[in-house]
Amino acid sequence: MYSIVAEESGLLPRERLLQKGAEVLSDQELLAIVLRTGTRSESVLSMANRILKGMTSLADLSRLSLNELQKIPGIGRVKSIELKAMVELAKRIEKAELARSEQIMSSQQVARRMMLDIGDKPQEHLVAIYLDTQNRIIQQKTVFIGGVRRSIAEPREILHYACHLMATSLIVVHNHPSGEAYPSRNDIDFTQKIKRSCDDLGICLLDHLIVGKSTYYSFREEREDFEL
């Protein structure tokens, strides 16, 4: 293993973190700490710099598969696993921050949360978020994952859990694996169906959101009075 060689002009990234805090470190320095070591011919700082230059933004790291990470020169099996674990942990931390004693105040708030959660899934996922009288989350549940024979859940599957949890309202969210968030005719029909079923049971359907990797569509925001 080959460790980073310090430049005479400055401290090593780990030393800078200890003395000045993680927030002052550059992306290159933080990535170098995660990578830990370079190769015989390249320091870990140079490797980190090369990796970052090959990306449009840090967000690209979250989109690379293990195989794609291993194709980067200097990134073997172990480093690719460590990077993937770091990215997943960062996602979970952000989701945990969003969920902490969270009261749902807007569709945008939910969309931000769900873009992280299911926005980049290769299959369609339908999630129901069940809320109490104060719009606090009781439970978030993946109700359906798309398959060959079915592409959307039935209202009864969603409402079964709503009744069990004694939820007073709910939000339905699903992703489009294509990344586009505009509703199809099936999406509109499904929304009409779930809204009628909720009304029949006295449960408020606050919204149906469609999310992609970086965009979303809200039936409540886009359709006046949520009338479909």
Curated annotation (Swiss-Prot):
It comes from Streptococcus thermophilus (strain ATCC BAA-491 / LMD-9). Residues 103-225 form the MPN domain. A motif (JAMM motif) lies at residues 174-187. This is UPF0758 protein STER_1430. The keyword ATP-binding does not apply. Belongs to the UPF0758 family. CDD domains: MPN_DUF2466. The keyword Isomerase does not apply.
